[in-house]
């Protein structure tokens, strides 16, 4: 992620995660805020906005100046949230420009919470186990893969439960 606190302030709170290739920035005198348990997906751009507690901004979405993403709301991947838009709590917004599609279900909110928790666990595990290594010259045969509780995209989870 590129966290540009050079002009405006960045405020990323406890339990929040900002994933690979995100950009956070703000104009001078403004700030970008990601509240507790906020989840910012890969490639998202936040510029001078506020992401409230437990909200999720999907991959490659853009949230522009003075927009507010409500508590436990979800911005779909690739959405464009215009300046000054107020996204209501517990809603799904999508599109270019983003518009409110519907309220989120309890199942969807539980899925989001599980995803955020998995990123917190990744941080703990990384601090505990990362060490300097020498790059491999060839793939290791039968290399062990990471073992995590089943964490699936929501669509795959729903299909499995159907």
Give the residues covered by each predicted segment.
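A cytosolic small-molecule/anion-sensing beta-strand core signal
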Residues: 14, 36
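Surface-exposed loop/turn motifs in large extracellular/passenger domains
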Residues: 9-11
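N-terminal first-folded block
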Residues: 1-7
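Glycine-rich hexapeptide-repeat left-handed beta-helix
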Residues: 6, 20-21, 26-27, 31-34, ...
């Amino acid at each position: 992620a590129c966290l540009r606190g050079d002009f405006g302030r960045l405020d990323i709170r406890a339990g929040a995660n900002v994933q690979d290739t995100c950009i956070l920035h703000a104009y001078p005198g403004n700030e970008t805020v990601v509240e507790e348990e906020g989840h910012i997906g890969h490639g998202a751009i936040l510029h001078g906005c506020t992401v409230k507690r437990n909200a999720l901004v999907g991959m490659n979405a853009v949230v522009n100046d003075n927009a507010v993403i409500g508590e436990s709301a979800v911005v779909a991947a690739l959405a464009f949230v215009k300046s000054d838009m107020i996204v209501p709590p517990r809603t799904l917004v999508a599109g270019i420009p983003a518009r409110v599609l519907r309220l989120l279900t309890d199942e969807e909110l539980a899925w989001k919470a599980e995803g955020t928790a998995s990123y917190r666990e990744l941080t703990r595990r990384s601090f505990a186990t990362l060490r300097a290594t020498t790059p491999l010259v060839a793939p290791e045969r039968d290399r062990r893969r990471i073992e995590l509780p089943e964490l699936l995209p929501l669509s795959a989870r729903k299909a499995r439960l159907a």
